[in-house]
């Protein structure tokens, strides 16, 4: 399965809620060198494969070969591997896409179901949706999260006046994370925008730049 959508739409929260339904291993990728990313990845896998993080893996191929050999097989339901923010890993190690393709195509890896998630629309497109993409046509489920509609904002922020709802939606859009931040602010909409966005110390002051960097 592949889940994509711009930053702050709630992909990680959705994955965490979903993973509670059955055996699952969540790996949240971060930026860094290829070696540090593999080490962190292996540490996360140790939650399912004890001792997995105690080994140094020189390549992604060796890591996934070891993973396939040790991944649980005896449960009534397969243990799912969730890789969140996959583009961080592929940006550092372009070969990882082909390694994942090999895992999906290899019958010996059928007991390792994958859920891949990412915020970079350009990179997720290149990994999964382009006809030349390594993983093209291999996902059984494709989910693209969209911003929430304006009809959801009033109840979420306890706003009743239609004009106030429209103004708030113009400021925060349909992004759940922004709504949560706005709900914790004192004062009116302008006070919240000033505190969160316009202030140099505001949580969202550099948000536009961060979103654009995701697509570099």
Can you say where each PLM-predicted feature lies in the sequence?
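Phosphate-binding site recognition
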Residues: 1-216
């Amino acid at each position: 399965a592949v889940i994509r959508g711009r930053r702050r739409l709630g992909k990680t929260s959705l994955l965490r809620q979903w993973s509670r339904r059955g055996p699952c291993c969540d790996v949240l990728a971060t930026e860094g060198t290829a070696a540090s990313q593999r080490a962190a990845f292996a540490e996360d896998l140790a939650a399912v494969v004890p001792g997995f993080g105690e080994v140094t893996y020189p390549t992604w191929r060796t890591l996934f070969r070891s993973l396939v050999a040790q991944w649980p097989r005896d449960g009534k339901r397969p243990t799912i591997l969730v890789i969140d923010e996959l583009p961080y890993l592929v940006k550092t190690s372009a070969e990882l896409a082909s390694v994942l393709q090999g895992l999906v195509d290899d019958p010996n890896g059928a007991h390792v179901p994958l859920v891949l998630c990412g915020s970079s629309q350009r990179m997720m497109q290149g990994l999964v949706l382009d006809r030349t993409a390594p993983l093209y046509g291999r996902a059984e489920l494709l989910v693209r999260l969209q911003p929430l509609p304006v009809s959801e904002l009033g109840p979420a922020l306890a706003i009743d006046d239609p004009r106030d709802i429209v103004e708030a939606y113009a400021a925060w859009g349909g992004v759940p994370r922004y709504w949560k931040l706005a709900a914790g602010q004192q004062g009116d909409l302008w006070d919240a925008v000033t505190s969160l966005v316009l202030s140099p110390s505001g949580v969202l002051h550099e948000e536009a730049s961060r979103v654009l960097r995701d697509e570099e």
